[in-house]
Amino acid sequence: MQREFVSGAGLGLRRALLEPLGAGDGVRVDFLEVAPENWIGIGGRLGRQFRELTERLPFLCHGLSLNLGGYAPLDMSLLRAIKGFIEQHDIRAYSEHLSACADDGQLYDLMPLPFSDESVRRVAERVRVVQDVLERPLIVENVSAYARLPGELEEVDFVRAVLEEADCQLLLDVNNVYVNACNFGFDAHAYIAAMPSRRIAYLHMAGHDEQGASLKIDTHGAPVCDPVWELLAHAYACHGERPTLLERDFNLPPLSELYAETDRIRELQRRSGEAQLRSLGYGT
């Protein structure tokens, strides 16, 4: 039986965080997220520590290698392994990137897709296959990019079309919207507002690297910047408060600094909830 979804503020789990999160009784996040490829088959001490956390907190999976946008056949053995991992650890939901990451072999990067009607149909068909195998909805994530491939659609229209054609949900990565808006010159606020509220499952927040005024690189290696915090508040204003997760992949600070950012997420969620109540005529 599929469990209820997560709520509140979450954190991406990295191996360096296993011991800090496992120490003591208080974990100050509401849920955690892992890349299943990094944890499938892990045993020993790390496996035991991971299992202890999955028994204490709700978990989400965020995949890296499924190659939803590629032309190579889907890796069914990987997909079956992910399904087993999800069932073993009572994972609440599984998401993947709207990108290509393999050809004859793994590319170890998330490559952009052509924003075309043909690409919409192909990706949607692969999403439906994944959902059939997993026997659960798939959540797809908008990705950062540094080049554009030929296509007749804008990014926002491509993402919306995939969601409708595949009948799937969205992981709205707010930092990726900001990075792409800076890199390609579109309106980040309009992009977020255009996403279909009923499709948004949860949100991602992260930091990025500044490569001059016109190039941003999504690194997950820095604190979230003020413009991205403002976009998160805008997302809540447009779509209501949603579960939101902080990603930090390297340059890991003390856990207290990560908690300060997840606390800021909670504060924005609280303000969004209060604003919604006021709009309905409750409160002052």
From Swiss-Prot:
Q: What is this protein called?
A: UPF0276 protein PA3283
Lineage: superkingdom: Bacteria
The family database entries (Gene3D superfamilies) matched by this protein are listed as: Divalent-metal-dependent TIM barrel enzymes (3.20.20.150)
Q: Which HAMAP family match?
A: UPF0276
InterPro entries assigned: MbnB/TglH/ChrH, Xyl_isomerase-like_sf
Indicate the family of this protein: Belongs to the UPF0276 family.
